[in-house]
UniProtKB/Swiss-Prot annotation:
This is Phosphoribosylformylglycinamidine synthase subunit PurQ. It comes from the Archaea. The active site is at C85, H196, E198. It holds the Pfam family GATase_5. Residues 4-223 form the Glutamine amidotransferase type-1 domain. It catalyses: N(2)-formyl-N(1)-(5-phospho-beta-D-ribosyl)glycinamide + L-glutamine + ATP + H2O = 2-formamido-N(1)-(5-O-phospho-beta-D-ribosyl)acetamidine + L-glutamate + ADP + phosphate + H(+); L-glutamine + H2O = L-glutamate + NH4(+). The lineage of its organism: Archaea, Methanobacteriati, Methanobacteriota, Thermococci, Thermococcales. HAMAP family: PurQ. Part of the FGAM synthase complex composed of 1 PurL, 1 PurQ and 2 PurS subunits. Its EC number is 6.3.5.3, 3.5.1.2. It is found in: Cytoplasm. CDD domains: GATase1_FGAR_AT.
């Protein structure tokens, strides 16, 4: 059974539910303090929260911690690396994913359920979805406005949409270019996404649509 490290920085607050989602998806998971090593694990998740209270920029300080050197090695070795919300911000700050997360177009914290369109199923985290599938997850962020100079040169995995899959301005909660909600590296083993799949991993929570992210990751790590 693949083992996953869920990295905990000062200010991380989505670690317990992320561990639970991985276990429900068939993997083993442990919370790992950022000063410890993750080398013995098969994959790594950087969960949501407010690492270092978002000082300087969201994710900026966490991205410069020593543990990120091991995360970089994971990425280069082809092992799965998932960044959720603040974790996505950390991955862009560390240069492991292209682009940047800027303050929301309307400068306030946004917490609500949204629809996503699955744009790329050829990644370690989306192989169990159908291309074009519409899924539902919550978001909770103040700096989720994704920007990249040339969107045509990146792998867009998730896009904000309406319930019918239309990529409208109204469906875009934060002003992200091309309604982008999640991107991967060229190899497809590193994914950053602003929506919270761990909060959509049980019907009791309102949706199980996010569970496939973790199930896909577990299946990928078995290879």
């Amino acid at each position: 059974m693949p083992r996953f490290a869920v990295i905990v920085f000062p200010g991380t607050n989505c670690d317990f539910e992320t561990v639970e989602a991985i276990r429900k998806a068939g993997g083993e998971a442990e919370r790992v303090w950022y000063k410890e090593s993750i080398r013995e694990y098969d994959g790594v998740v950087l969960p949501g929260g407010f690492s270092y209270a978002d000082y300087l920029r969201a994710g900026a300080i966490a991205a410069r911690q020593r543990i990120m050197e091991e995360v970089r090695e994971f990425a280069e070795e082809g092992r799965p690396v998932l960044g959720i919300c603040n974790g996505f911000q950390v991955l862009t700050e560390a240069g492991l994913l292209p682009g940047a997360l800027r303050p929301n177009k309307i400068p306030r914290f946004i917490c609500k359920w949204i629809y996503l369109k699955v744009n790329d199923t050829n990644t370690a985290f989306t192989q169990l979805y159908e291309e074009g599938e519409i899924i539902r997850m919550p978001i909770a962020h103040a700096e989720g406005n994704y920007y990249v100079d040339d969107p045509s040169r990146i792998r867009i995995v998730f896009q904000y949409s309406d319930e019918n899959g239309n990529l409208t301005e109204e469906a875009n909660p934060n002003g992200s270019v091309m309604n982008i909600a999640g991107v991967s590296n060229e190899g497809g083993n590193v994914l950053g996404m602003m929506p919270h799949p761990e909060r959509a991993s049980d019907a009791f929570l309102g949706s199980e649509d996010g569970l496939k992210v973790f199930r896909s990751m577990v299946e990928y790590a078995k290879r």
